[in-house]
UniProtKB/Swiss-Prot annotation:
Disulfide bonds: C27-C147, C51-C135, C85-C100, C96-C114
Keywords carried by this UniProt record: Disulfide bond, Glycosidase, Hydrolase, Secreted, Signal
Keyword Signal listed: yes
Family: Belongs to the glycosyl hydrolase 22 family.
Catalytic activity: Hydrolysis of (1->4)-beta-linkages between N-acetylmuramic acid and N-acetyl-D-glucosamine residues in a peptidoglycan and between N-acetyl-D-glucosamine residues in chitodextrins
Official protein name in the record: Sperm acrosome-associated protein 5
Catalytic residues (UniProt): E56
Family annotation (InterPro entries): Glyco_hydro_22 (IPR001916), Glyco_hydro_22_lys (IPR000974), Lysozyme-like_dom_sf (IPR023346)
Length: 160
């Protein structure tokens, strides 16, 4: 009975999160990422971040994926419950000090702050397999075509 109650609570939380979720348009997300200081952060461009968000979640803030090891990944950047957030189920390091469900709404500043922490780790963007497979070494300018963002001309600049 206790397990059933836990499942009901989790489903209720996910339903509420889904109601406040958003699937971002590419250029809309590019603008948010640029405004949050991701262009040039640790030498990566908004194109890198758009590419990761596309392949991880399809720009969907409510996306949750479950891994064979029992951990889950949350939000637009698919932040893992074993390392970056706490879902109350998976043993976690919770390195971003955040509840995983807080990553499932349209308010992505907390996702961005946590993603910056991931990018600042020893793995940097390689922490996302999608970046290694689809983004690294590719022309990422296509991700920004038609978007009115003010990008830094020197992507090695970092104001953080």
């Amino acid at each position: 009975m206790k397990v059933c109650s836990i499942v009901v609570v989790i489903l209720a939380v996910l339903l509420i999160a889904k109601l406040d979720a958003k699937i971002y348009e590419r250029c809309e997300l590019a603008k948010k990422l640029e405004e949050a200081g991701l262009d040039g952060f640790k030498g990566y461009t908004v194109g890198d971040w758009l590419c990761v968000a596309h392949y991880e979640s399809g720009f969907d803030t409510s996306f949750v994926d479950h891994n064979p090891d029992g951990s889950s990944e949350y939000g637009i950047f698919q932040l893992n419950s074993a390392w970056w957030c706490n879902n109350g189920i998976t043993p976690t390091q919770n390195l971003c000090n955040i509840d995983c469900n807080d990553l499932l709404n349209r308010h992505i500043l907390d996702d961005i702050i946590c993603a910056k922490r991931v990018a600042s780790s020893h793995k940097s963007m390689k922490a996302w397999d999608s970046w290694t497979q689809h983004c690294a070494g590719h022309d990422l300018s296509e991700w920004l075509k038609g978007c009115s963002v003010r990008l830094k001309t020197d992507s090695s600049y970092n104001n953080w």
